[in-house]
A protein has these predicted regions:
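Non-catalytic terminal extensions of PLP-dependent enzymes
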Residues: 1-129, 254, 304-326, 332, ...
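Single, functionally critical "micro-switch" positions that shape active/binding sites
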Residues: 74, 136, 242
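Conserved PLP-enzyme active-site core in the AAT-like
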Residues: 109, 139-306, 392-393, 420
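A short, small-residue-rich loop immediately preceding and capping a beta-strand
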Residues: 128-134, 162-165
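General small-molecule cofactor/ligand-binding pocket signal
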Residues: 131, 185-187, 410
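Hydrophobic alpha-helical membrane segments of integral membrane proteins
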Residues: 133, 273-274, 350-351
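Short strand-loop junctions, especially beta-strand C-caps/beta-turns
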Residues: 135, 190, 214-216, 384-386, ...
Length: 486
């Protein structure tokens, strides 16, 4: 590897006057940018030749890690394989060249895909209607809460401003509620890791707008008392919100709508194999039960006879608006391709296989890693670090050492219920051979913690970047080249 190209920022490879491009001949005449719109000084951009740029970014990409590189057991993230067919379909010019303002008659096929995706999600979740407008999972979560707020406002029930979330909830739950102008109230978990119904009962009154739940929850445990919980919430006039972050193990097993949830969002990048990360694009469809459809944002697509039309109003004073046009259409298209590829028969296998894989790893390692809640899990589970605490090897050390063996680390120190949390989620894609290899490596690290703890505590040793100073990075974040150059 050329360390000069890898170890420096692209700005540090810049040489004045060096060019990697050429401009075409000007065939449109000379048109100056108005003086008031011109820069006062040159843009601070790197000047590099094409080969340097290609080598630099190729080296960077080779030192990244993704699902296509290897096993990625990042708990609560559902890092499943994104089939290439998804990308091929999304790249078809019939879809890629669409414009959101073109006439309905010229994009009937695209509108049909949008409509069919709405119906597919309804069938999978048991909810009446979906909007595909939200641009990310957290955006969908916010949209769902806005729907709930609009519902209560339409009834003149303005004092319902509280949202109850479990202490094991995803961080986006309280964050979305706060952004929506709602007050967050925390409900405790039992020693078994599920919602404490007695504690919840004491929190319910006529100020509660909704209860947000993830099922299975963040510990990978199924909330068995949902029937009782939803009855209590509905009796007090609140709504049930389903955080679709952990929908994957539910596929083929049960549906949120059938359990009594009123509103939910789905993370397409988790359950339906669209790309993770990179800052977007994302998609967070929101579904509602019958009776709440009028509060969903527009535009939406409806079918009239054999034609599809765009509906831009729902005729409500309390409508929700979250973005222009149809959300991230290409992301939705990838997810719909995944659904069609699996079909009804195989999509029913997703949940059971994800659950089987998680329990297989858990049972194989519980003698060397502490299992705080020893019960059957769903798609993921949480260890509380090594069973033998005398070595001084932490969850962070184990995670760093895993990098040396070519695995991405699991989610660590979340949920906050355990001091040395290590959350592992294998997804349904992984073979038994992959799981066995991963188990063997974690057992080897547990043995290293006893025989050579310093090797583990100073890991990683085989990666291009060694152990970084997390505390310094948090205290003195340098996020741009300008900060570094100053």
């Amino acid at each position: 590897m050329n360390n000069r190209l890898y170890g420096n920022l692209i700005f540090e490879l810049s040489k004045p006057g060096r060019r990697g491009y050429s401009l075409p001949k000007n065939e449109f005449g000379h048109h100056e940018v108005p003086a008031e719109m011109r820069r006062c000084e040159d843009a601070k951009l790197p000047e590099c030749d094409e080969l340097t740029v290609v080598r630099h970014y190729t080296n960077l990409s080779a030192n990244n890690f993704g699902v296509n590189n290897g096993f990625y057991p990042l708990g609560s993230c559902t890092m499943k394989y994104n089939p290439i067919i998804n990308e091929e379909i999304a790249a078809l010019p019939q879809f890629a060249a669409l414009h959101p303002l073109q006439p309905e008659d010229t994009c009937q096929g695209a509108l049909q895909v949008y409509y069919d995706m709405q119906k597919a999600l309804s069938a999978i979740t048991g909810l009446e209607e979906f909007t595909l407008n939200p641009f990310a999972g957290a955006h969908g979560e916010l949209t769902g809460l806005m729907v709930i707020r609009a519902y209560h406002q339409s009834r003149g029930d303005l004092k319902r401003t509280k949202v109850i979330v479990p202490d094991s909830a995803h961080g986006t739950n309280p964050a979305s509620a706060a952004v929506c102008g709602l007050e967050i109230v925390e409900v405790k978990s039992t020693a078994q890791g599920v919602v404490d119904v007695n504690d919840l009962r004491g929190l319910l009154d006529d100020t509660v707008a909704a209860v947000m739940m993830t099922n299975p929850n963040t510990l990978g445990l199924f909330e068995r008392k949902i029937p009782e919980i939803q009855k209590l919430v509905h009796e007090c006039g609140g709504l049930m919100y389903y955080d679709g972050a952990n929908l994957n193990p539910m596929l083929g097993v049960c549906r949120p709508g059938d359990m009594g949830f009123d509103v939910m969002h789905i993370n397409l990048h988790k359950t339906f194999s669209t790309p993770h990360g990179g800052g977007g694009p994302g998609s967070g469809p929101v579904g509602v039960r019958k009776g709440l459809e009028q509060f969903l944002p527009v535009p939406k697509v409806e079918k009239v006879g054999d034609r599809y039309r765009i509906v831009t109003t729902n005729g409500q004073d309390f409508s929700v608006h979250v973005g222009e046009f149809f959300g991230n259409y290409a992301v939705m298209l990838r997810a719909y391709t995944y659904i069609l590829t699996l079909g009804k028969e195989h999509i029913r296998m997703v949940g059971p296989l994800a659950t089987l894989n998680a329990n297989y790893i858990k049972e194989a390692l519980k003698d060397v890693y502490e299992l705080p809640i020893p019960t059957v899990c769903k798609h993921e589970f949480v260890f509380n670090g090594l069973k033998d605490k005398s070595t001084g090897v932490t969850t962070m050390d184990v995670a760093k050492r895993l990098l040396d063996y070519g695995y991405h680390a699991p989610t660590i120190y979340f949920p906050l219920l355990f001091h040395e949390a290590m959350m592992i989620e294998p997804t349904e894609n992984e073979s038994k051979e992959t799981l066995d290899e991963f188990i063997a490596v974690l057992r080897k690290i547990a043995e290293e913690a006893k025989t050579n703890p310093e090797e583990v505590k100073t890991a990683p040793h085989n990666t291009p970047t060694g152990r970084v100073d997390d505390v310094l990075a948090a205290k003195q974040p340098i996020l741009t080249w300008k900060q570094l150059s100053n």
